[in-house]
């Protein structure tokens, strides 16, 4: 099958996709080959490119459907075609989009879906099964596996560990990643704060943790039992890093809420305040190639690993530095600078809030592409940004309320010019 046919086979299974997200969805195809495949498909009239939500999207055309059916009919059986060509709208469509986006991100990060490698969660929890042996030997000590929400529900029902009501709530959980570093609960909020009920999510997380803790695998394998005993952690997947201040403030514009008592809608949205009632640690990754790398780091590196990564960066990029422990985080003073430097190899929401609450100003080192979302979250105390190659990065300046202080935002028409000191 040619690269163009692989592209069409994938587009056949979905309604449409952002053009730039194809590199994530088809991560096994080299970038240049994918670009050429798209160009050829457009030339042949097999795909259509259109604008949606201010970005280019791509979908298969009727000619493309006819072509791929003729060349790949053995793999595109009639039942699969009927299911994949069905067009979903409303909340059901958004849920499917969240699952597809999360699945693509995990595949690109080297985290396979359990159902795609033929491992069942219910079988994995029994130590004398082949699925358990395969999981422990091939995946547990690596990046782990992604178990989607429908399989979690089926396992809860099959084990009878908790009541069936734990599977029928309107939880927004997409799935969980299990590896030797912990259990990560994945949510996909796309480009806006989605509805998120604390009681539903708490009940769901408790039910999943209970079936894992009470399993044969937990009782007979110390490493698996250790993972089950760790604190709950969530990974929030959003369209861009502009979602970071929105999640932290609970405001759809990312502005600080001045009167929380009148912000009742946020009580039922995916916000950090609500997340912290269920999860001890909450992380964010955007849906792009940078997000793939951040997702991989988030689920494979402990806080000690991250602090070692920071220490290694300092050794390579600075002449002299002094590290200070601040809770479990690392702060540093570089080359006798009076202002501290914060280094963010991943985006942990609690760390951003903790550092913003401090009194000192700071320089920030982070991945290129995350700086504007972090700048809006951190506010007045940010001095400047550098990327992980120690190169300066431009970023808008914001005050502590999340309002631009270096000009007017052309989209929201809010902001001001700060007077020079």
Regions found by a protein language model. Give the residues of each.
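Accessory beta->alpha helical hairpin/"wing" motif in late/C-terminal subdomains of nucleic-acid enzymes
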Residues: 39, 49-74
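Short acidic, hydrophobic short linear motifs in intrinsically disordered regions
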Residues: 16-26
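Short helix-capping/hinge SLiMs at alpha-helix to coil transitions
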Residues: 10-16
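Short, amphipathic alpha-helical interaction segments positioned at domain boundaries
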Residues: 63-93
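Exposed, interaction-prone assembly regions rather than primary DNA-binding/catalytic cores
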Residues: 84-202, 206-209, 213
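Long, compositionally biased intrinsically disordered regions
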Residues: 186, 191-194, 202, 206-208, ...
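Short alpha-helical "packing" element that flanks the helix-turn-helix/winged-helix DNA-binding module
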Residues: 3-8
């Amino acid at each position: 099958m040619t690269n163009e046919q692989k592209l069409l086979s994938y587009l056949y299974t979905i309604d449409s996709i952002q053009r730039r997200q194809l590199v994530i969805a088809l991560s096994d195809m080299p970038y240049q080959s994918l670009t050429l495949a798209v160009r050829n498909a457009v030339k042949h009239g097999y795909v259509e490119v259109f604008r949606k939500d201010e970005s280019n999207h791509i979908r298969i055309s009727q000619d493309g459907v006819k072509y791929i059916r003729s060349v790949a009919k053995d793999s595109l059986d009639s039942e699969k075609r009927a299911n994949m060509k069905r067009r979903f709208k409303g909340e059901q469509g958004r849920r499917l989009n969240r699952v597809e986006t999360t699945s693509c991100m995990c595949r690109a990060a080297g985290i396979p879906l359990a159902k795609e490698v033929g491992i069942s969660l219910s079988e994995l929890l029994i130590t004398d099964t082949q699925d358990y042996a395969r999981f422990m030997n091939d995946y547990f000590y690596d990046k782990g596996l992604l178990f989607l929400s429908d399989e979690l529900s089926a396992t809860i029902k099959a084990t009878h560990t908790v009541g069936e009501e734990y599977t029928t709530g309107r939880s927004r959980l997409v799935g969980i990643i299990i590896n030797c570093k912990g259990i990560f609960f994945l949510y996909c909020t796309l480009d806006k704060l989605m509805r998120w009920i604390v009681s539903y999510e708490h009940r769901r997380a408790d039910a999943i943790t209970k079936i894992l803790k009470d399993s044969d695998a937990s009782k007979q394998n110390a490493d698996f039992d250790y993972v089950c005993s760790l604190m709950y952690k969530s990974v929030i997947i959003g369209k861009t890093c502009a979602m970071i201040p929105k999640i932290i403030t609970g405001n759809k514009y990312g502005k600080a809420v001045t009167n929380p008592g009148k912000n009742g809608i946020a009580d039922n949205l995916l916000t950090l305040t609500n997340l912290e009632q269920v999860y001890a640690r909450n992380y964010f990754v955007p849906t792009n190639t940078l997000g793939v790398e951040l997702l991989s780091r988030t689920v494979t590196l402990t806080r000690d690993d991250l602090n070692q990564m920071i220490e290694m960066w300092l050794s390579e990029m600075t002449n002299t530095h002094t590290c200070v422990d601040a809770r479990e985080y690392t702060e540093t003073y570089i080359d006798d600078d009076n202002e501290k430097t914060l280094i963010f190899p991943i985006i942990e929401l609690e760390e951003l809030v903790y550092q913003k609450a401090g009194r000192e100003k700071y320089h920030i080192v982070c991945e290129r592409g995350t700086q504007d979302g972090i700048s809006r979250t951190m506010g007045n105390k940010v001095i400047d940004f550098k990327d992980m190659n120690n190169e300066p990065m431009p970023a808008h300046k914001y005050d502590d309320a999340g309002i631009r202080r270096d000009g007017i935002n052309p989209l929201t028409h809010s902001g001001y010019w700060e007077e020079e000191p």
